[in-house]
């Protein structure tokens, strides 16, 4: 809705829609608050069956576009690299690596360079504009998946800076990664804390939960299996079933 950038108070476009669909409860809540209309939740369809699962290695993975804080929807890669560096310096993470994957537009190259400088001297691998086969290989072989979108942001002032849903989280779970994600926005609707992953509110919690997983193969394996099962709730089949329910309730064909 680019016209909302010109005049956020002009909601006349809503008169041209019979129904509004939201991609999460988080989005629905803000549609209600900002637009004053009710929406139906329809989670995006994800091809979970296509995500490969291979022998897991001591890898932590984070995936998202490189966007500097204050510019847009930042995935907070810099903060995650710094947190991982802190974990490495404290010890007890022998053999573990962090892989940072994401697209990078020319305007964001200074931010990418900042992330790369923070990674120097650490077992951190930065993959800018990685091809899809490499991304899938990292999904398949990584053990833990990190998300920090929204860290340090104010939801009341800028709700768009948070994950409205979290497609890459579901993809990682389908590939058998244990998600350790920020306890904000759409991530809350995907990851059930202590059941199929963990949610955190501070970087100290992120480090503690990740360290617990890194040191406990049995726990990591159990949560990984639960994560794969949970990802099925967001499959294409689940999407079709949910859409049919919505269509029937609304009298649509």
What does each model-found stretch correspond to?
Residues 201-205, 218-250:
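A charged, aromatic-enriched C-terminal amphipathic alpha-helix characteristic of glycosyltransferases
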Residues 33-37, 46-50, 55-118:
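Conserved catalytic-core segment of nucleotide-activated headgroup transferases in glycan assembly
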Residues 1-20, 27-29:
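Membrane-proximal helix-turn-helix segments that form the acceptor-binding/catalytic region
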Residues 140-164, 177:
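Acidic donor-binding loop of glycosyltransferase active sites
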Residues 193-204, 212-217:
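Conserved acidic donor-binding segment of nucleotide-sugar-dependent glycosyltransferases
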Residues 156, 181-194, 198-199:
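Short acidic/histidine- and often glycine-rich active-site loop of Leloir-type glycosyltransferases
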Residues 102, 112-137, 141-144:
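Nucleotide-activated donor-binding/catalytic signature segment of Leloir-type glycosyltransferases, i.e.
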Residues 169-174, 178-181:
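Short hydrophobic beta-strand element within catalytic cores of glycosyltransferases
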């Amino acid at each position: 809705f680019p016209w909302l950038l010109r005049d956020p108070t002009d909601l006349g476009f809503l008169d041209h829609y019979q129904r509004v669909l939201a991609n999460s409860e988080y989005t629905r809540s803000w549609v209600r608050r900002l637009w004053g209309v009710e929406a139906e939740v329809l989670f995006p369809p994800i091809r979970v069956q296509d995500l490969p699962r291979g022998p897991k290695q001591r890898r932590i993975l984070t995936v998202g576009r490189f966007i500097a804080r204050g510019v847009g929807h930042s995935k907070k890669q810099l903060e995650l690299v710094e947190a991982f560096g802190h974990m490495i310096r404290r010890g007890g993470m022998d053999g573990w690596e962090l892989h940072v994957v994401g697209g990078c537009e020319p305007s964001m190259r200074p931010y990418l360079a900042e992330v790369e400088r923070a990674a120097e001297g650490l077992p951190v691998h930065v993959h800018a504009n990685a091809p899809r086969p490499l991304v899938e290989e990292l999904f398949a072989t990584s053990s833990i998946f990190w998300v920090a979108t929204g860290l340090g942001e104010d939801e009341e002032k800028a709700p768009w800076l948070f994950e409205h849903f979290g497609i890459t989280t579901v993809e990682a779970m389908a590939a058998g990664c244990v998600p350790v994600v920020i306890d904000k926005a759409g991530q809350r609707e995907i990851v059930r804390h202590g059941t199929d992953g963990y949610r955190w509110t501070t970087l100290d919690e992120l480090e503690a939960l990740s360290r617990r997983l890194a040191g406990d193969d049995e726990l990591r394996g159990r949560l990984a299996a639960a994560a794969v099962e949970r990802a099925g709730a967001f499959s294409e089949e689940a999407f079709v079933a949910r859409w049919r329910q919505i269509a029937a309730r609304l009298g649509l064909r």
